Amino acid sequence: MKSVCFYFKIHQPYRLKRYRFFDIGNDHYYYDDFADDEIITRIARNSYMPMADTLLEMINRGNGDFKCALSISGTAIEQLQMYVPECIDKLRQLADTGCVEFLSGTYSHSLASLEDPEEFMREVKAHDDLIYRLFGRKPSVFANTELIYDDDIAMLIASMGFKTCLTVGAKHVLGWKSPNYVYRACTAPKLKLLLTNDKLAEDISMNFNNPEWDEYPLTADKYISWIASLPEEEQVVNLFMSMDTFGSFLPAGTGIFEFMKALPVFGKEMGVQFTTPSDAVAKLKPVDEISVPYPISDIDEARDVSAWKGNELQREALSKLYAVAERVSLCDDRRLKQDWEYLQSSDHFYYMSTKNMADGASHAAFSPYDSPFAAFTNYMNVLADFLVRVEEQYPESIDNEELNSLLLTIRNQAAEISSLKKEVTSLRTDVMNAEEKLPETPEATAAPAKPARKPRAKKAETAAKAEPAAAKAPAKRGRKKAE
């Protein structure tokens, strides 16, 4: 029986406000809160929430037969919590069904896997911790930013304990091979790979509402029949796409939600089931290994990383940003680290692309800037202020090794002080407990003594008091006789 593995991605960056050269050193807040609020509220109401309701209906109608996977960046979660908290509740409902697998990824949808392995691993941990806190699910399958992958990244992913990774079925990598199998990484044989079927995924995301497409209109029964007619040995079809495709790029009026709801119905008729990545790799064995010496991604026609690193503007911005990665990781300034997280989002570099033709149109459609050069200038102004703040924390005159040594000493001393404080507190508690257990002394148990009577005056004192009285008495009698 053939399986379809749907993977839906949710991501939103923190958009930068207009930041001029004269703001450097004076304004340390970089974000366009109004744009973030407006965009994520609109997309959540038009896309994320209706799609979540659609998936819930598909799951409930089939008594749990429909399954899929979901990937949400940390920055998207933060914005949903701030502006559309009811959307988080919808996602929790999906998690509670047990039919939706939450995937691992980078917190800010960053390019750290291409620039800094340590920062990449830190981001993945931060993302997965957030997913666990919110949805009670610990991700075990990895999906990198826009499915970026190569042989070196495979080793990093495997070293973090992941057994499965999703990536793109790029033609220049697969050659004559089909993406509809489970593969393994050549540099990490225990890491299983699920590759997206670009053609079938684009038939929904790109062609569903295209009247010039030769297969228009696309219906659920037609789509499922294409999958069912694939060669018998091709057992898994991976369809990876952005969740805002549904309701935003393909508005509800196109019938996209009804199309999705009908898929499980026709799937049951034609022997096609729906699965999660974990279930797919549990049932199917890898048929071959895949070697990817150069990075691939799910963006643009070339299926490489030129969308973010294709020109000097992008490479310069990335180089400047990640040059301070180690220093930022060593600091304890919460606000500085938060800005570091947000400035890593791949979207900032995507807006700087100078590509032409179809790729260029796609970049321009998503960009809030008038041109790639405006995107670069604004980002570099923000980055300049950020670097000034990093310099204030840790001057460049101190090299990283010396800085690391000093900070390690400070942290060790802080840990020792904390340990000693705990020891003092423990000793005080022990002393108090010991005092309570001591037996009471006889004096403490004896009845309280009656108050002492006033002591009698000594005889000498009595006589001394009597002498003046005696002296006065005879004198009085003598005066009477004289009279």
Per-region residue spans from a language model:
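Acidic, His- and aromatic-enriched active-site or binding-groove loops in soluble protein domains
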Residues: 87-104, 125, 137, 158-179, ...
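Short, well-structured secondary-structure segments
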Residues: 3-8, 14-17, 21-116, 140-143, ...
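An acidic- and aromatic-residue-enriched active-site/binding cleft used to recognize and process polar
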Residues: 8-13, 73-75, 107-110, 136, ...
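Active-site and substrate-binding clefts of carbohydrate-active enzymes
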Residues: 1-46, 181-191, 195, 210-213, ...
